[in-house]
């Protein structure tokens, strides 16, 4: 399956490849996927702890989180990329990448088929309300402001209780249809753990469950 991979703010695709290396290795034993990475187009200072791995000129984001114009441009650019380079079976997003993936799915929630058959969210940031963005207002999309779920494809929500922003990841789950949700708290922080092997196994099983739900539709 083709999986589009979207990195976090202040990193890049090479960092996401490194972050997911153990998980992808574990998944290769049971499932065959092709991972395709897209870099953000906005320069951004490196995320905490990333400075040792990438230079200032390599540190990117998809959008500036306080700019409605920047966020809308990121949605439009990725929408166009998917139309030109797709179809993709699934999407994997970390932090800001997960937020952007959710905004793409939310934009297309009446589309058949949807842009992705499943989504894998790591330490997800909340998506923004596109209607508010169009009015120049940066406002999170929250379940209490929507009439039911806006994401109807199977979703894996993998986060850590030590993440200072874990409340956003948990709020993201409420935007997704309950039948397709798979939740996993890996117990760590704002990261995709590569050790211990038991945690990697747990994450792989969560992804496998979501892919299976997408394939069999239940």
Swiss-Prot record:
GO CC, alphabetical: cytoplasm; nucleus
Function: Esterase; part of the gene cluster that mediates the biosynthesis of the gamma-pyrones fusapyrone (FPY) and deoxyfusapyrone (dFPY). FPY is an undecaketide and thus likely synthesized by the polyketide synthase FPY1 from acetyl-CoA functioning as starter unit and the addition of 10 malonyl-CoA extender units by successive Claisen-condensations.
Entry's induction text: Expression is induced in the presence of 6mM glutamine.
EC identifiers of the protein: 3.1.2.-
Molecular function (Gene Ontology), one example: hydrolase activity
Enzyme kind, highest EC tier: hydrolase
Pfam families the record matches: FSH1 (PF03959)
Gene: FPY3
Entry keywords, A to Z: Hydrolase
UniProt-annotated catalytic positions: 95, 163, 190
SUPFAM superfamilies assigned: alpha/beta-Hydrolases (SSF53474)
Known pathway: Secondary metabolite biosynthesis
GO-annotated biological processes: secondary metabolic process
Organism, as annotated: Fusarium mangiferae (Mango malformation disease fungus)
Protein family: Belongs to the LovG family.
Keyword Transmembrane helix in record: no
The protein's name in its UniProt record: Esterase FPY3
